[in-house]
Amino acid sequence: MDEINFAVLGTGGIGRRTLEVSTYKDGLTPVAACDRHGVAVNHDGLDVEEILDATEGNIAGDGTGDTEDKRVTDGGAAVKQHGDGAGIVASAQGTSTETPIDEIIAESDEIDAVLLALPNLEHDFIPRIAERFAEAEFEGVLIDVLKRSRVIGMLDDREETLVESGITFVCGAGATPGLLTGAAALAAQSFVEVEEVEIWWGVGLKSGYEDNRGTVREDIAHLDGYDIETAREMDESEIEAVIEEHDGVLEFNDMEHADDVLLERAGICDAEDVTVGGILDIRKDEKPTTTTVRVTGRTFDGKRGTNTFQLDDATSMAANVNGPALGYLKSAVRRNRAGDYGVFGPAELMPGF
């Protein structure tokens, strides 16, 4: 397979780790990155180490996902430094701009794929970003790590536009949905009928809210009594109060995660047969529970069983989000170069059911 160059929109926690993990992947070269204050572009390849050093504890963003601001590219409030000097512009490779996404789009003729490491604090935010690339006649791959079920339908509504542009869009390509729906799709192959898919995840974030503001804010939207709108409007003290109220450990049940619709569109099972929950510990690196996928079904010879897949507790959220996302990116580029355009979920890139 030919070399692949790609861009990252957003240099918060996920975006920075995407750049770092890519340095361990053969055939992948990051050539552009941006956040709300600036952009870095080098078609020969970014100096990832320099960018990571420059943006450590220095992430631009406001955490509220103000998508009416054309500069918005990440979901994390300024972690340890505020102002226009935060984020990518602190890098020697960075250039200040009021329109960072437009700057990436302007370079997109020479970019194979774009990974959207962005917040989803408005349901239509990611779909609107996809539209902007399509309107610019971008031909290539878009990858996101979104979690919200209803967003998949919004992307499907735009599929014709994406196909006309020549875009292959893989949605939900992180840990959950991405890695875990892929595992569920494989586990389902033992059965002729899948009755139930249970996904239970555990994440430890010793670096806490300050270094993971966008992720934590999005997760709070899944708690009972909250939704994406209320989470978006909460100020920093309110977010911290929720964390304190739960002693730093948030438990989620029956989450609106995209795993359900992605498994349904792949023909594995009905969306209503998928349940997702988990525990987030914002004060410890250790996972509070083992991430587990359980697929229950009936085999061709009438046996009922459950296939179980677990992630080792030693693997971090960053490893389980960014490794799969870049893997799906590689697969999507193959499809795109073969002329296969449209919207795909991770399970659709696995063996068919």
UniProtKB/Swiss-Prot annotation:
GO molecular function, one term: transaminase activity
Residue positions, PTM Allysine: 147
The protein's role, per its UniProt record: A 'suicide' enzyme that participates in biotin synthesis. Catalyzes the formation of (S)-8-amino-7-oxononanoate (DAN-carbamic acid) from (7R,8S)-8-amino-7-(carboxyamino)nonanoate (DAN), a function equivalent to the cannonical BioA reaction and the first half-reaction of BioD. The cellular requirement for biotin is thought be low enough that this single turnover enzyme supplies a sufficient amount of the cofactor.
Matches recorded under HAMAP family: BioU
Pathways involved: Cofactor biosynthesis; biotin biosynthesis
Subunit structure: Monomer.
Catalytic activity of the protein: (8S)-8-amino-7-oxononanoate + L-lysyl-[protein] + CO2 = (S)-2-amino-6-oxohexanoyl-[protein] + (7R,8S)-8-amino-7-(carboxyamino)nonanoate + 2 H(+); (8S)-8-amino-7-oxononanoate + L-lysyl-[protein] + NADPH + H(+) = N(6)-[(2S,3R)-2-amino-8-carboxyoctan-3-yl]-L-lysyl-[protein] + NADP(+) + H2O; N(6)-[(2S,3R)-2-amino-8-carboxyoctan-3-yl]-L-lysyl-[protein] + CO2 + NADP(+) + H2O = (S)-2-amino-6-oxohexanoyl-[protein] + (7R,8S)-8-amino-7-(carboxyamino)nonanoate + NADPH + 3 H(+); (8S)-8-amino-7-oxononanoate + L-lysyl-[protein] + NADH + H(+) = N(6)-[(2S,3R)-2-amino-8-carboxyoctan-3-yl]-L-lysyl-[protein] + NAD(+) + H2O
Lineage of source species: Archaea, Methanobacteriati, Methanobacteriota, Stenosarchaea group, Halobacteria
Keywords for the protein's UniProt record, in alphabetical order: Aminotransferase, Biotin biosynthesis, NAD, NADP, Nucleotide-binding, Plasmid, Transferase
Residues annotated as the enzyme's active site: 147, 218, 222
Protein family according to the UniProt entry: Belongs to the BioU family.
Organism: Haloferax mediterranei (strain ATCC 33500 / DSM 1411 / JCM 8866 / NBRC 14739 / NCIMB 2177 / R-4) (Halobacterium mediterranei)
Superkingdom, natural source: Archaea
Binding site for NAD(+): 10-14, 214-215
Primary gene name: bioU
Matching SUPFAM superfamilies: NAD(P)-binding Rossmann-fold domains
InterPro entries assigned to the protein according to its UniProt record, in alphabetical order: BioU-like (IPR044262), NAD(P)-bd_dom_sf (IPR036291)
EC number: 2.6.1.121
Protein known as: (S)-8-amino-7-oxononanoate synthase BioU
